Structure formats: C-alpha cells, structure tokens
Amino acid sequence: IARYTARDATFNGFEAKFSYAFFDSGSNRASVSVFGDLVKAEFDNGENVPRIPPSKIGAEVRFSGAEWTGHVHVTRHGEQDDPGRLELATPEYTLLSAYADYHIGLGRDSELKLFIRGDNLLDEEVRTHSSLLKDFSPESGRAISLGLRFEL
C-alpha cells in the first residue's frame, strides 16, 4: 500500500535538440541530430523529488531513399545520484539502437515493408530511474527483430 500526496516543489531544467540535413539529392536524404536534457527537482524543504530521470545526451543519424529508410540512435543516460527519499541511485548506461526498412509498393495505396530493428545493441543493464520496478527488474537486454509490415 502506498500513499501519494502533493507537495510544493521547484523543477529546473532544459531540453535541447539540433538537427541538420547534410545530404538531400532527389529521394535520397540524410540528417544528423544531437539532443540532451537535464532536470533538477527539490521539494521546498530541500529533499529531492523521487523518480526524476537523470540527464541524457544523444545523437541520431537518419537516412532515406526512394524505397528504404534507416536510422542509428545512441543515448547516454547519466547516473542519477540525487535520488529521492527511500530511493536508490541509478547507474549510468548507454543505449544504442538501429533500424532499417525496405518498401515494396503493392499498388496505389498499399506497401509492404521488410525491416530489421536492433534495441540495446550494447546489451547494457538498463534501470530506468523513473520506474517503480527499477530495483527489482531491469529493462530487456539486446534485442534484434526482423519483420514484415503491410500498410494500406
């Protein structure tokens, strides 16, 4: 049983993203993005607010052509070393993911997509600080999926 109550708190932080399309020729495009965020939160009595995610910084490269798209995405999640009362700190980790698909047109309004997707490719132990289950169960490890998607 848990009891949740509202308390006065101050949140400070930022979020930023910069994207740049470095190649654009006909149906072929490529871009890069960098991003990051940071949140600090304290109750008015000076205690840390619980389940505040740590800072993160990352980058993504996206590319596409007439019949294909893809991206590679890396995000560094910092250590959460300012946990709230009754919380444990969370270690830092890096997530690397990739995705690519190939489009096969099946007429005027439908297509088939063949895709491959990889998540947590570095097989990091991920404990999402904002999760109530972080101390009991990490997120899933490396996952690679092959698939087929039909779109109308």
What are these regions (language model features)?
Residues 1, 48-53, 78, 87-91, ...:
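Flexible, surface-exposed loop regions and adjacent strand-edge segments
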Residues 2-80:
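Gram-negative outer-membrane beta-barrel transporters
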Residues 10, 28, 53, 92-94, ...:
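Residue-level preference for beta-strand/loop junctions
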Residues 12-16, 55-59, 94-100, 142-148:
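Hydrophobic, lipid-facing positions within transmembrane beta-strands of outer-membrane proteins
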Residues 19-23, 101-106:
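Short regulatory "switch" loops immediately downstream of catalytic or recognition motifs
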Residues 79-81, 102-152:
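C-terminal beta-signal and adjacent terminal beta-strands/loops
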Residues 83-90, 100-103:
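Short, glycine/charged-rich beta-strand-loop motifs at protein surfaces that mediate ligand recognition
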